[in-house]
Each structure stands twice: as structure tokens, then as C-alpha cells.
Amino acid sequence: MKRLLFVSFFLMFIFLFTDSVYALSAAEVSSRNSECPVIELASANSDGSLVKVGCYDNYEQAKNIMNTTDNDNLVIVQDGKIVDAKYALIDYDQYTSLGYTNIYSDISLSNTLTYISGSYSDDAALIEVDYNSGRCKIKVGGVVGWIKKYENEANKTNVLYDIVPISWTTSPNYYQVTDDSIIHHFYKNVYLPIDKKYSSITIGRKPSMLNPGNYYSYDGNYFYSDLKTLLIDYKNGNYNNSVNSNNPFYNYYQYLSFRSQTNYNADNINQYLGARTTSNSKLYNTGKAFIDAQNYYGVNAILMLAIGINESGYGNSSISQTKNNLFGINAVDASPGQSATSFNSVSDCINDFAFKYLSGRFLQPGDFRYFGANLGNKYQGLTVKYASDAYWGEKAAHYYYDIDEYFGFQDYNYYSTAVLNSDYNNTVYAKKDPNGYNVSSKYYQYRKKGSAIIILDEVKGPSVNGNTTWYKVTSDPTIDGNMEYYDDNTYYSTTPRINYLWSKYVYVPAVYFTKITNGGGKINENLVIIPTPTPTPDPSPSPSPTPAPTPSPTPN
């Protein structure tokens, strides 16, 4: 009896005070005998058991009782499977034929927003379930959208997610704020034992609006002390009950425009890489290549390096070693090693990445990959179309943080930065000057909330919504001396390659942006510009409908 009491108290301690997720596996839930002929309403107890509450003739009856009863642990069960829950997360599957799961804008699945893979982290907030189709509305990595229940809906094969009621979760992915930093803790599978935490990364310096402690968030901007409150807000489409509802967090490294310059030089980069790698690494001694690419193509060297470290495992992955490919370029999830692009040299890879993939695509308004000029998340930024990892932007930001910490944070908050304060369409155009015309006949505009700019000056201009302040900012696209940006044919065929003009700026109305830092740093317009050789012509520079370059799941 004493042994049983000890075990009981030990298990209670685990459930209440550990950073883990416990639940019945999908197989265990499915093998449970059905308690009702059609629909069962059950209570999901914290020990992983399901206790019948009542039987119903249809889903709608059970749903109504579930939503109007005080019991927060209620779930709807059919044929031994949980098909809905009052408050729950989902565990999305990592084993699909494509290697990822699409997220769609609406239940009709007519428009793909982005894509995710459970190979990295597999829990998301469950907002809504459509019983008839099995499709569900979720939030993960900042994006809200719908996913399918089955990879093949016609045959109902390959289930893409399981519903995990929050009574079975004690700590899914969560953020830890310390006295000096913010850390993201990941679990790769919500059913793993408590000692199987996948990874933890420091993504930035301590957010000023958050006290030390543990928090939940599926966007990295608004944080919650408990999952129930988070889910209530998500279901209501707001952040009213988050701990920072009036002051969202924008991690400097995730929301720094690529059209910026680092304060570090080639020697600094080589010093850092010398401390983190060996001479066998493909990143070893690449400082000059990164700085030259920054100066010529207008892309922050440390942001590029951070992506390279994340994608190549510090230059030691098989793709980087055999193909000189530091950035996972074309390493699609289904066949990363086979599909990844080969380069003649590491410097060729760095130059192609800056010129073709960043300046030519991800930073080019009008390209289907353009969602803003920063790392961002699955809602906004490069992360939307670059990678299937919902937290790819945070992981790249982690390496920028590591580099910056190594040298005493000389880049952190250097610039005055701001983010677009809402979604806009055909509203926020970049101007040649506050009183002038839009930049380019192609109408370069900012659309997605969170799109980042660096503010180089504040000037007065025409009043917009009662505000006469305009921001002078660096341009997302590469523009020419006439403030036009290039068509694909001109951009890719010109020799030597077209360089970014650091002395050309654009202007945007301040009323549409929220300032997040006040660093006041300036752009060096007199950088040494070294024309870089053209490795190989781009055989198909125009955007294709295929998925964007996708990093390999883990460094090989």
C-alpha cells in the first residue's frame, strides 16, 4: 500500500509539475471499446483515460452539450476516436508522401497559405473542427488556417492529425523568459515521455514586456500563462487575455529587414566560425564571401550566415559537404539530398543565394514567395514559403543571437525598426519621396502585418489619416537609379550582375507602422562594392508553382 501511495504521488507530481505532454497514443484511443452506438461525449481525465458522460444520436447534440457544460475536459468520440474537443491541441503528422502538410485559408482548401512538417515540432492550437469533412482550423507559427484530416480524402487514408485535449497536456512547446533572454522549448512528438524533449533554443534577448516565467504562444508575439486562455482567445479571433495584449513582442532578429548591414566584418565572422567549427566545415573562413555578398547584393551578411548555419549544421551536413549548398536550396522535404542544388564552390552558393533566391525572389514584391523582407514566421516573412518548419525563422534568429552575443551585442537594436501594424491591400505603397510617385510601375507595397522596415529618418509629408510623418527606409526590391525595380529578364541576364543601390531609399507613411526599436543606426552608402562572378545562368528565373526551396529536415 505504501508503494502504491508513493507511485500515485509521484505520478501526480509528474502530471502537475513537469514540462511534458502526456496522452493516450492514437492507437490506444482507437483500441478503446466504443461506449456508445453513435456519438459519445466523454471526459478526458489527466491520467489519460476517457470516462463516458453520455451517448447522443448525432454530433450536433454532443457539440451543444460540450460547449454549454462547465467541464473543460469534454471530448466527442466516435468509433473509439476523438473527433472534437472543447479545448485541445492537435498533433500533426510528420509522415506524408510529400513530407509536409498544407495549410489553407478556408475550409474549401481553395488557397494554400503555407506548409508545415511534424519532423521538427508537431503541436498546434485547435480552433475549430468541421465534423463532416474532418478538416480543422488551427494556429501554428503565427498562421491561422485549415488542414485536411486525411492526406487522401477520397479514400480516407493517412490521417494527418490527432486531437489532444489539454487535460492530457502539461507542457507542449513553450517559451521561457529569463532575466536576460527568451528561450523556446520544443517537443517533437506530444506522446513522448517527459525526458524526451526535442530541443531548446535561445531566440533573442528578454522581451521588455514579459516577466520571467513560462508562457505559451503559437505566434511568438502574444503570450499566455495557460493553454485554456490561449485557446479561448484564438477561438474568438483576438489576443485580449494575453499577458501582453497591448504590447506584442517582435524579436529583433526575426523582424530585422534583410536590407540592412551588420556592424561585423569578415574577420569577426571568421573569428566566430573558428570558435564554432573546424577547418572541415564548409563555412570555415567564409567571412569575406558573406560581407562581399552583403555589400553588392544588399542582404545582411549575418542574416545570411544564420540561415546557412541553421540549414547546413555549421557547414557539416552532407548536402553542404557534397554540394557546397549551405542554404538547403531546393532540398525539398521528400528528397532533400537528391534534389538539393549543387554549386561549384561555397562562394558561388553564397552569391547565388543573395542574388537569385533573396534579392530576386523572396525580397521581390510580386514574386509568390514575397511576404516581407524579414525572417518572420509562418504568417509573414521568409518562413512562409522557405521552409516547412513552423519555427524556421526563430531557429535562424537563434544563430544571429548567438553570433551577436559572442561579440557583445553590437548589432542588437542598432537600427530603428518598425513593423506593419495590420494587413493591408492596395494601401501601403512605397514612394520615391513623400510628395512623389509610387516606387516602380509595378506598385511595390506592404501587405502583411509584421512586415519589417528599418527607419533611417523621419520626414514630413502629406497627411495620411491625420498623420504627416513619413519614414525613410531601405527598399525591399533591388531598384535602379530611376526608382524602378527590374523585370526578371533584365535582372537575371544583365552582366555583371545587378547590385543593390544602398543610396536609394523609399518613403512610407508612418501611420501604417508600429515602431519597435529606436536604435538610430545608419546605412553606410560608401561600402566597397566588389562585382561577384556569375556562377551559372539561371535556367528558369520566373517563379514556378512548385513549393519554394525547402531545407532538409535535419543536417545530414
Language-model region placement:
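Acidic glycine-/aspartate-rich tracts in secreted/extracellular proteins
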Residues: 459, 475-479
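Ser/Thr/Gly/Pro-rich low-complexity, disordered linker/stalk segments of secreted
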Residues: 519-556
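Surface-exposed, glycine- and small/polar-enriched segments that build interaction surfaces at terminal
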Residues: 455-457
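Catalytic cores of secreted/periplasmic lytic hydrolases that degrade extracellular macromolecules
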Residues: 22-303, 314-451, 462-468, 481, ...
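Pyridoxal 5′-phosphate
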Residues: 311
